[in-house]
A protein has these predicted regions:
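Acidic, metal-coordinating catalytic segment for phosphate/diphosphate chemistry
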Residues: 1-23, 27-29
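Short hydrophobic alpha-helix segments
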Residues: 5-6, 37, 88
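A short local loop/turn or secondary-structure capping micro-motif enriched for an aromatic residue
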Residues: 11-14, 41-45, 120-121
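Short loop/turn microsegments at loop-to-beta-strand junctions
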Residues: 21-22, 62, 118
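Recognition helices and adjacent regulatory flanks at domain boundaries
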Residues: 42, 69-70, 100
Length: 154
């Protein structure tokens, strides 16, 4: 139940205000998972590989609308279909998120045109497994991969 709204800066200030976010994982037919590299200028986890799409749900916005908006803003995807993977609570030293996670196989129209993403590429399960725990990925991606994606997508 939503009980109010807060600025992104408040949510990421260490206040641990629980806030909703969407994640979209994009797979291709070869079972490769598309990840995006966060810019070095990001406050949280700069330069690390992360979920293809991730972003805050705006106050009054529904999950589906947020997913479509964030996918377009970050990787240029629009009018795609997505299946729910699940929801989970993520907590770090500075934030607490309710994550709504989805997967899409509509990968052909990925078009990076955002200052939110440095680069993107498809990763095999083996490549992901070899890099877990080495500081290559964001902690949130690693948690989601181990608890949700590993057994459901690969």
């Amino acid at each position: 139940k939503v009980i109010g709204k807060a600025l992104r800066s408040e949510c990421h200030s260490g206040s641990k205000i629980l806030h909703p976010v969407v994640h979209l994982h994009v797979m291709n037919p070869r079972k490769l998972l598309y990840l995006q590299k966060r810019p070095e200028t990001k406050l949280i986890q700069p330069g690390k590989w992360d979920t293809a799409v991730g972003g805050h749900i705006a106050f009054g916005e529904d999950v589906k609308t947020a997913l479509q908006r964030e996918a377009y803003e970050e990787i240029g995807l629009k009018d795609f279909s997505a299946k729910p993977i699940g929801n989970y609570l993520f907590e770090s030293d500075i934030e607490r998120e309710m994550v709504y996670s989805f997967v899409s196989y509509d990968y052909k129209s990925i078009n990076l045109h955002s200052d939110e993403v440095t680069e993107g590429k498809f990763w095999s399960q083996k490549q992901i497994e070899q890099n877990l725990g080495k500081g290559v990925f964001t902690p949130n991606f690693e948690l989601e991969y181990v608890n949700q994606l590993r057994d459901r997508l690969f």
